[in-house]
Amino acid sequence: MLSVYEKGNALDKRVLEEWLLSEDILMENAAMALERAVLQNASLGAKVIILCGSGDNGGDGYTLARRLVGRFKTLVFEMKLAKSPMCQLQKERAKKVGVVIKAWEEKNEDLECDVLVDCVVGSAFKGGLEPFLDFESLSQKARFKIACDIPSGIDSKGRVDKRAFKADTTISMGAIKSCLLSDKAKDYIGELKVGHLGVFNQIYEIPTDTFLLEKSDLKLPLRDRKNAHKGDYGHAHVLLGKHSGAGLLSALSALSFGSGVVSIQALECEITSNNKPLELVFCENFPKKLSAFALGMGLENIPKDFKKWLELAPCVLDAGVFYHKEVLQALEKEVILTPHPKEFLSLLKSVGINISMLELLDNKLEIARDFSQKYPKVVLLLKGANTLIAHQGRVFINNLGSVALAKAGSGDVLAGLIVSLLSQNYTPLDAAINASLAHALAGLEFKNHYALTPLDLIEKIKRL
């Protein structure tokens, strides 16, 4: 997993003060990272347009232009007059080696290009973009688009101006910034990469409590013993609500992810031999012996024995439970909560936090972190375009999910994966992380995003 920071200022300061690297060296390395992205996506001689702002982000752009001129048809547009000392210096250096620099007002030529590089605002963006920064029309003329550090129009909280630069790849300088991982930013950053600034990243980084999950972090269930039986791999119990299909999907998902036994219990529906999958065990009552249980999928009302069940085994709580105040009984237990934003708002209201959906979406990371600090036994998995998993103030971000998962039943499959890992003795945090990764990666395996069904998803999970 990768370390994530709200801002890179403290990291850069450490490089300058402790290791005596200069701003010049940092900027040269930033330009080298951008240069690699250009070389990977364009042939020599291709046309490259670089948009430069007034600060150090613009300085990165002028440095890039100096490195490209002679190999590419390089054109720089000065979107704002160079103001920072490094930006002014790099602009002069670029001019000395023959880089063509024009004011934006001089754009009287064909703006079509092979590569368009955004070095306008970066991390300095606040408020709204100036009217003349028409990235949308410019982007339509470029075959490939690169953003330096942060696409212009995304602020430090991940809020996005509707006219923001939409990149095919974003090179985050030094380390990944949390603003690049907001739900709203997901459509603007493209592929996310880190540009190293002259120091190995593990030396460059400082301690953080925010992390980006990677494919390599996934630890699938392991059956490495030959002398074993079903009891060695746990008993997961799934309680079915009024909409029984949701719980059945969870149960099938749990069975496909390694649980030795998966049982179901009908709370608000009827299950018969005709509509129960043969591989699931039917229980009329809550089992006396079990490893973990899942409740909430398709549920309308909280069962009267809910509090008693919480004492018997670790659990996953999903969907319908968050609309009932009885869920507060679970907040002092080791449980995994898996709400989507609307359900989380209902839960927050129950604990006395009244905010709007807009406030939640604009401050999702901070709110999830604060909630996990207030309820340290709980693991919160907050769904969204990027999933947040929060525990005791640490937040793990899964940005691997795709639009293929935007289907009814997808979340039920996820609940089943989590309860399966819980039943196999994963810690609640590890269960949430690994289930989330498996869920996302299985979604990426499906070719047509529009066609994925929950049962397809389970089949893909079996093949990870």
Curated annotation (Swiss-Prot):
Residues 213-464 form the YjeF C-terminal domain. Residues 8-205 form the YjeF N-terminal domain. (6S)-NADPHX 1 binds at residue 149. (6S)-NADPHX 2 binds at residues 298, 412. Residues 213-464 are annotated as: ADP-dependent (S)-NAD(P)H-hydrate dehydratase. Residues 56-60, 122-128 are annotated as: NADPHX 1. Binds 1 potassium ion per subunit. It catalyses: (6S)-NADHX + ADP = AMP + phosphate + NADH + H(+); (6S)-NADPHX + ADP = AMP + phosphate + NADPH + H(+); (6R)-NADHX = (6S)-NADHX; (6R)-NADPHX = (6S)-NADPHX. InterPro entries: Carbohydrate_kinase_pred_CS, CARKD, Nnr, Ribokinase-like, YjeF_N_dom, YjeF_N_dom_sf. GO terms for molecular function: ADP-dependent NAD(P)H-hydrate dehydratase activity; ATP binding; metal ion binding; NAD(P)HX epimerase activity. One of its GO terms (biological process) is metabolite repair. K(+) binds at residues 57, 118, 152. It holds the Pfam family YjeF_N. Residues 340-346 are annotated as: NADPHX 2. It comes from the Bacteria. Its cofactor is K(+). Signal peptide: none annotated. The keyword Lyase applies. This is Bifunctional NAD(P)H-hydrate repair enzyme Nnr. It comes from Helicobacter pylori (strain J99 / ATCC 700824).
